[in-house]
Regions:
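Extreme N-terminal starter segment of soluble prokaryotic enzymes
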Residues: 1-5
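Short acidic low-complexity segments
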Residues: 25-36
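N-terminal Rossmann-like NAD(P) cofactor-binding module of classical short-chain dehydrogenase/reductase
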Residues: 39-40
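Rossmann-fold NAD(P)-binding glycine/threonine-rich loop
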Residues: 46-53, 66-88, 94-106
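Proline-centered loop/turn at the N-terminus of a beta-strand
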Residues: 61, 85-87, 117
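Conserved anion/nucleotide-ligand pocket segment
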Residues: 98-102, 106-146
Length: 146
């Protein structure tokens, strides 16, 4: 059985992951970080920074879906990734990854012929506005357009 520690377990994604894990006999959620096989982080940037240090100390791989990470936290992730397996994605949706691939292709074929803007709408309880996905797409457009 794979032991998962969910950092941010009371949030929307953390609750969803917890429900999925509880419905699967191959995984178990643990409250004890040191007994975890993997840490899944959907928390807040300040909490992500702390959990990275704990994972380094105990050599625990990570999946990070927290958004709004600043340069300092991203640098910590980069350093930790040299020691630990880390998956970092602001959005885990297959559709978003397909959208990003399509945007890259479109921009390459239509450089200097279009102007882009991003508008997003969320539920009232959305904590990170603009979303990590919107920021990622904005950066992708800027990077591909140069």
């Amino acid at each position: 059985m794979i032991e998962l520690y969910i950092n941010g377990s009371s949030g929307r994604m953390g609750t969803t992951i917890n429900d999925l894990v509880n419905a699967n006999d191959e995984f178990n959620v643990t409250d004890n970080l040191t007994s975890a096989d993997v840490v899944i982080d959907f928390s807040h940037p300040s909490s992500t920074k702390k959990i990275i240090n704990s994972c380094l100390k105990h050599n625990i791989p990570m999946v990070i879906g927290t958004t709004g990470l600043n340069k300092d936290v991203l640098e910590n992730i980069d350093i930790a990734s040299k020691t630990l397996p880390i998956v970092l994605a602001a959005n885990m949706s297959i559709g978003v990854h397909q959208l990003k691939d399509s945007l890259k292709s479109f921009i390459k074929k239509n450089k200097n012929r279009v102007n882009c803007s991003i508008e997003e709408t969320h539920h009232l309880k959305k904590l990170d506005k603009p979303s990590g996905t919107a920021i990622e797409i904005e950066n992708l457009i800027k990077d591909e357009d140069t």
